[in-house]
Amino acid sequence: ESLIICISQSGESYEVIKLIEKLSSNITVLSICNEKDSSLVKFSRYSLLCKAGKEEKTSTKTFITCYQVAYLLAMKLCNQEIDSTQWHKLSKIIENMVNGNTPWMSKAIELIDGSTFVQLIGRGPVFAAASQSALMFMEAAHTPASALLGGEFRHGPLEMVKKGFIAILFAHSQSETYE
């Protein structure tokens, strides 16, 4: 038997619903979603609700909570222990970031403010965050942005780096780039 995991903020994404409708009955669907009464949740054999609350403009809260739920699911599927102390610390860090309570936030805003384009670079497990951040720049800040894998950036767009070029690098703690 196969498992497909579908992640959606609204649970009504056309592409996701059409995919599920075409799946054979021997494929198990697990959904990660913010809306308990959505079509996605109804079509799924199992569902994990993020409970991120109502989104005001962009799906920032849902993205963060879906990421957390997916991480917990991956840990469970791999029979990994979940350290509740570390998990609570991470939740507090995320809460502070969402509320703008981080010492580096104002400096980052100052550096990015007025830019005409932002390049976001990530690899591995943090590439999803880079992609979502590019979307947020375009939706919320009305600033053109693009997310690229580190290797993609190194073999092409690196040539466009010049004075005033803004790039944000996402590096996970196991990455050589992190150091």
Regions found by a protein language model. Name each.
Residues 16, 104-105, 153, 179:
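Amphipathic coiled-coil/heptad-repeat helices and related helical stalk/stem segments
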Residues 1-4, 115-163:
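Anionic-ligand anchoring segments at beta-strand to alpha-helix junctions in alpha/beta enzyme folds, i.e.
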Residues 7-9, 94-100, 144-147, 172-173:
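Short, flexible loop segments at the rims of nucleotide/cofactor-binding pockets, characterized by
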Residues 37, 107-111, 155-158:
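Short, flexible, glycine/charge-rich loop motifs used to bind or transfer phosphoryl groups or to couple energy/partner
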Residues 1-91, 123, 158-159, 164-179:
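Glycine-rich phosphate-binding loops that contact phosphosugars or nucleotide phosphates
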Residues 98-114:
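A short, well-structured juxtamembrane/interface segment
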Residues 80-87, 101-105, 143-144:
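Short, structured loop/turn "capping" segments at alpha-beta junctions
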